[in-house]
Structures are given as C-alpha cells and as structure tokens.
C-alpha cells in the first residue's frame, strides 16, 4: 500500500444520491467532515454513525465521513477481484485512517472477502490505515482500532 494513489475528500465533491432524512432517528451530528450526510442503509448504520460522532466529540477521532457508494471522484473503495468494496465510514485519526464497515449478522458470512481485503489493506499500510467490520453493535471492536 502506497500513498501514490491516496484518495482525498474535497468539500465540493461530496454529492450523495440522497441526504440522511431522519428516518432512523435524529442526532446532532457535529463531527461529520461535510455539512451534509449521505443516507444510511439501516438503523444499525445510523447508530454506528452516532457512536462515531460521539467518539469524535470526545476527541478520540478528528472527524468521520459517511462514505458514498459508486460515486466516482467522491467515494473511497478497495478493489477486489470481482468488484469494489466501499466501507461505510472513514475516520481520521491522529496519523491514521480507519475504515469501518457495519454488517448485519445475516450478511456476515457473505462479507468474508470484504473483511479479507480490508484487513490486507490495513496490514500493508505500515500503520497508516486501519480496518474493522462490525456486527451486532460491537462498538468495542471499533474501540480497539482507535488506540
């Protein structure tokens, strides 16, 4: 993994297909990098975003981004043999980036390739990148990557 092809988020390039409209609940997001937030696929993803924002407000991470899917130029992805993997969230930590994917327990087994490519990306980064896939609100799995 090299910085040669590093992805950068630009404020004017964040263009979600749909903004989050409050359908899973309301939360005063203060640490999302952009003024708008792309919609969440599930209540669990929304709850994960709330947890990340709370950690950012406590100073445990600098900011986070709801990653977009299949949005050229404004989405982060990891290339797989059979397509692309777009983690749900990216978090800026001091000196590192943390990619977080929330996966429902019913889709956990099918997401093994995503876990493997995320783990490989983190392993080859020399400590600059971290990855975690979470299920069943196991926020402690994210907590371990914040240290």
Describe each region flagged by the PLM.
Residues 1-85, 91-96, 102-147:
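Intrinsically disordered, low-complexity, repeat-rich regions
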């Amino acid at each position: 993994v090299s910085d040669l092809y590093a992805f950068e988020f630009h404020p004017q390039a964040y263009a979600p297909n749909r903004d989050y409209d409050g359908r899973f609940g309301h939360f005063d997001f203060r640490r999302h990098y952009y003024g708008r937030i792309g919609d969440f696929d599930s209540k669990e993803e929304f709850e994960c975003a709330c947890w990340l924002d709370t950690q950012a407000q406590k100073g445990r991470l600098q900011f986070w981004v709801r990653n977009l899917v299949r949005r050229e130029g404004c989405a982060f992805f990891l290339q797989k043999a059979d397509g692309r993997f777009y983690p749900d969230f990216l978090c800026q930590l001091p000196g590192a980036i943390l990619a977080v994917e929330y996966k429902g327990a019913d889709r956990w087994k099918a997401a093994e390739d995503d876990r493997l490519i995320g783990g490989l990306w983190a392993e080859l980064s020399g400590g600059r990148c971290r990855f975690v896939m979470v299920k069943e609100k196991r926020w402690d799995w994210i907590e371990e990557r914040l240290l």
